[in-house]
Amino acid sequence: MKGKLIGDILVVKKEPEDLDEIIKLPYINKVVKLGKIHGQKREPDVEMIYGEGTETVHKENYCKFKFDVARIMWSKGNTGERLRMSTLPESDETIIDMFAGIGYFTIPMAVHSKPKKIYAIEINPVSYNYLCENVKLNKVEDIVEPILGDCGLQDFDHVADRIMMGYIGGTHHYLDSAMKYLKPGGIIHYHESTPEVILFERPVQRVQMAAEKVGRSIEVLNKRSIKKYSPGVHHTVLDIKVN
């Protein structure tokens, strides 16, 4: 069976030859063919092969994520990073998730680490609505405050112990805002799509430049490649302490 299972939906790149057998499986209620992804909102072309509707609830690491696979991206390749982030925060932390989406990182952190507060910012209204639903679905309303808007235009002033920047499309443009939001000694988890030849050099330089502009210094705590994003390009993440 080729494809990836998201909730009760089997997502495929082409119609399976063994479709009759697949739809007999009790955990598959729908089969969806996704085509090219395009636009700033990263929405794919969709063809319904079996079943009705493209909304599902996906379970991972004791968390529930409700979303529409036709309108929202779900990357299996980021599973390890979601698991890692779920255990890093301390219980007294205030966290800002600048690119919250449907709660990819916010929900695991809230469910497993139970920090004091997570401000989860999302600019896409569709993703924001699912974020709000997922906060309720996982019963973390007392921890997570969803915010609809531009993460670069918020009023936070050095309130965050930890900042999530889990987006790879021009994330560096928001580093100045992250510096404004982050407390001295706070940590930024900075994601970027980076060519192999400058795999960690470029993201480190970008964070360092943003810090130096406001008289701050950085300490790189961890750096890793999450996955290959495209030929010669990696999805990288850096954990950086900003003093």
Locate predicted features.
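SAM-dependent transferase fold signal centered on methyltransferase-like domains
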Residues: 1-243
